[in-house]
Amino acid sequence: MHYIVMDLEWNQSPRGRAGKCGDMPFEIIEIGAVKLDEQLQEVGQFHEFIKPAVYRQLHYKTKEILNLDVKELEQCRGFKPVIQDFLDWCGDDYLICTW
């Protein structure tokens, strides 16, 4: 079994709650992860930014924390192919750990 220690970065409406899109207050724009074996030794890394589909402008705090510009994200792939690659990278026997 592998342990997948992952971190997600999120964006939200640049207008805060007033601009929230239905039941989707946040959108994943980055997936980062480290794969550990059963001895907790690192055996792989995954990192990819994701092109926003819902909130195409960055919230000011997201921009500040990640030091990103939305133009950089526009060049990235969308969520579906990225999450599929991530799940393929995880393998068949894994446990996801996050905070």
Which sequence ranges carry the predicted segments?
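Conserved non-catalytic scaffold segment of RNase H-like nuclease domains
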Residues: 2-99
